[in-house]
């Protein structure tokens, strides 16, 4: 397996995300799967970031299983959360109570 920075954890080889093991600031440089990436935004401890580019509509995979679909293109190293990840199983709502599909 290619080199990956110890500040992130890859949970399963087929995952297209990894998990931050510590708070990561915007502009942090990491090596993920042998590729050098600069984080476009901060990622809190325990949260997800993209291991590679993820296309809009593509399944986001964690623990080797799909956890939802990308609502928009997600670049490698980008923070993956409710702003760009939608559930395929239940409606996703914004803070004002509007459904976001």
Which role does the model predict for each range below?
Residues 2-101:
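N-terminal small-residue-enriched
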């Amino acid at each position: 397996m290619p080199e990956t920075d110890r500040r992130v954890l890859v949970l399963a080889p087929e995952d297209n995300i990894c998990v931050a093991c510590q708070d990561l600031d915007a502009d942090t440089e990491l090596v993920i799967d042998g590729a050098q990436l600069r984080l476009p935004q901060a990622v809190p401890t325990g949260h997800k970031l993209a291991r590679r580019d993820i296309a809009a509509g593509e399944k986001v995979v964690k623990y080797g299983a799909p956890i939802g679909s990308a609502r928009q293109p997600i670049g490698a190293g980008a923070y993956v959360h409710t702003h760009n990840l939608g559930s395929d199983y239940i409606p996703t709502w914004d803070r004002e109570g509007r459904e976001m599909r």
